[in-house]
Curated annotation (Swiss-Prot):
Gene3D superfamilies referenced in this protein's UniProt entry, alphabetically: FAD/NAD(P)-binding domain (3.50.50.60)
Cofactor: FAD
Taxonomic placement: Bacteria, Bacillati, Bacillota, Bacilli, Lactobacillales
Identification of the protein by name: Ferredoxin--NADP reductase
EC code(s) of this entry: 1.18.1.2
Length: 330
C-alpha cells in the first residue's frame, strides 16, 4: 500500500529537526521525521546527554538530555499529526507528481516538501578495534554515557584523552568505586582546567598505554589488556564497565547523492533556506550561507522560516500569514 503523502518530511531528529516539527504542527500541517539513529535528540542526546549547555535562550544551563526531553515534550502536543521513523537512513529522493519520493534503507516515503536538518550527517562511535568488542557493546562497554548513576559502586575504566573522557572521569569520581583513565599519550587533549582537576583527583591515570585485548564471559567484559607505548609492559585492568571515549565519526556520503548544491560538506541555501531544488529546504548545521554561526540557537531561528516557506510552496493559494503561538494555543 502506498504511503500517504505528508505535508513536510524532516530529515533528521536532532534539536533543530524536532523544533521544526513542532513549529510545523503549530502551523497545522502534517509532519514526518526520518531519523537514522535509534532515538531522537541528535548529538546532544547521544554525545553529551549529561553535559551542560549554556547557550540556549531562556535557559541559564541545561543538559543535552534535558534539552531533548523538553523538545520531545513540546512536540507531543501535535502527536496526532506527527509521525516518527527511527533507524531509517535517507538514501535518495526524487521529484514526483505532487511532491517527492523519499527512499530510505527500509521504505519509500512521500512528502509534499522536505526540510533537511541532519546536521553534519550520520555519526558513529570510534571503537577500540579489538576482537570481541562488538560482543560487549551496550552490555558493559559503552561509547557514550546516558546516566551517571548506572556506574554507582563500579570499577570503571575509560579509554580516551579528550574532553569527554576527562569530563566523564571527573563526573564519576564520587559515584564509582574507582575510575581509571587509559590514554595513549602523556598529554591530554581536553580543556586545560579540566586536565588540572583530573591530575589532582583520585582518578587513576595510565599513560601512555594502548588497549590490546578484551577478556570476558558471555556479553560482559571483565578485563582490559593494555600495553605501554613502545614498550613490552602489559597490564590487565579488572573492570565492571568500560567507557570508550574516542569520539564519533560523521558521514554525509548520502547527502552528496541528493543532487543539491553544496559548500564543503553542507548544503547551500538561500536567505529563505531554499536549496537548489524547489520544495527542498535545509537548516541547522546541514545548511551553508555567508555568516552562518553553527549553534543550536541559530538553527532554532532558522526552523520557522523554513517551515513557513515550505507551507507557502505547498499551499501557494492559502492565506499563510504567520500568527503568534499565543493566538493558536489556549
Amino acid at each position: 500500500m502506498k504511503d500517504k503523502a505528508y505535508d513536510i518530511t524532516i530529515i533528521g531528529g536532532g534539536p533543530i529537526g524536532l523544533f521544526a516539527a513542532f513549529y510545523a504542527g503549530l502551523r497545522g500541517v502534517t509532519v514526518k521525521i526520518i531519523e537514522s539513529l535509534s532515538e531522537l535528540g541528535g548529538q546532544p542526546a547521544i554525545l553529551y546527554p549529561e553535559k551542560m549547555i549554556y547557550d540556549i535562550p531562556a535557559y541559564p544551563s541545561l543538559t543535552g538530555a534535558e534539552l531533548t526531553e523538553n523538545l520531545i515534550k513540546q512536540l507531543s502536543r501535535f502527536e496526532d499529526r506527527t509521525t516518527i521513523c527511527l533507524k531509517e537512513e535517507v538514501l535518495t529522493f526524487d521529484k514526483v507528481k505532487g511532491g517527492f519520493s523519499i527512499r530510505t534503507n527500509k521504505a519509500e516515503h512521500f512528502s509534499k516538501a522536505i526540510i533537511i536538518a541532519c546536521g553534519n550527517g550520520a555519526f558513529a562511535p570510534r571503537t577500540l578495534g579489538l576482537e570481541s568488542e562488538e560482543n560487549f557493546a551496550d552490555h558493559n562497554l559503552f561509547y557514550n554515557v546516558h546516566q551517571l548513576d548506572q556506574f554507582a559502586g563500579q570499577k570503571v575504566v575509560i579509554c580516551g584523552g579528550g574532553d569527554s573522557a576527562v569530563d566523564w572521569a571527573l563526573a564519576l569520581e564520587d559515584i564509582a568505586e574507582s575510575v581509571t583513565v587509559v590514554h595513549r599519550r602523556d598529554a591530554f587533549r581536553a580543556h586545560e582546567h579540566s586536565v588540572e582537576l583530573l591530575k589532582t583527583s583520585t582518578v587513576n591515570l595510565l599513560t601512555p598505554y594502548v588497549p590490546k585485548a578484551l577478556k570476558g564471559i558471555g556479553n560482559l567484559a571483565e578485563k582490559l589488556v593494555i600495553q605501554k607505548v613502545k614498550e613490552d609492559e602489559v597490564l590487565e585492568l579488572e573492570l565492571d564497565s568500560l567507557i570508550v571515549s574516542f569520539g564519533f565519526s560523521t558521514s554525509n556520503k548520502n547527502l552528496k547523492n541528493w543532487n543539491l548544491d553544496y559548500k564543503r560538506s553542507s548544503i547551500t541555501v538561500s536567505p529563505l533556506f531554499q536549496t537548489s531544488q524547489e520544495g527542498i529546504f535545509a537548516i541547522g548545521d546541514a545548511a551553508a550561507y555567508n555568516g552562518k554561526v553553527d549553534l543550536i540557537a541559530t538553527g532554532f531561528g532558522e526552523a520557522p522560516t523554513a517551515v513557513n516557506q515550505a507551507i507557502n510552496y505547498i499551499y501557494p493559494d492559502r492565506d499563510n500569514r504567520v500568527v503568534h503561538s499565543t493566538s493558536l494555543i489556549d
